[in-house]
């Protein structure tokens, strides 16, 4: 018979609480006005808790305790019912993945005025590794996220699906805004309420990846999109090749958004020790409607994507279609 006195009981409870706190690590990724909260328990599944406007420390604690948790990067093979971000064929032919957290690295990029957070994952069985990377710009309300995939298996591993990122959007009166069109009719705004089923925006043209559609979307969370009011999430894939954006709406409480390289006819054989880096997905959030998201994307692009983006420059107006050739006809005399 084991007798435990109050002092020993208090010690055991303290050790248990300490081990729980150490194993259930939460990560906060912030820009000046937005925030992404993740749960990254060592040896467990990385989960997204919240993405939206920046909150207080008290709200963060409350969210971490009560939030609905979604896998931060769902993979194929262990009963996940929705669309997955990553699927592979291992060297032995197996299709199963089960990724768990093995580490977290947070770095301050002083010269770039950004922070870099890397969630390190490893498969439970295979020497297969995925890093989920988050770069939060401190001079623009944009978080870029991408993945870095590698392995140490004896033979090449075939990557069959390799999305850059996954974002769960809570179901409700959510509307999607995106651009579509054709030659001489490009950039037409399409707005629609998200319904059950799959919504896919993709491109397979290679060199004309912005003529019929664009790899940028906005989610209006408060009903029909408004220009200056309402909560909006913006997402833009930073990639000039074939892309695919998927929105999977099933019987649960979420719209499952995934974006990345279009894997159709493009499976990749990843060699041992080779690193496959996916293109970044840029995310932003605004409670000032679509224009608020647009302004944040423009600021981020000027500061970090365009050469000399804040420098005024002359623009050549190409107006030959609007002017028409008849206006250029010389007098016959």
Each language-model region and where it sits:
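Conserved small/polar residues in nucleotide/adenosyl-binding loops
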Residues: 326-332
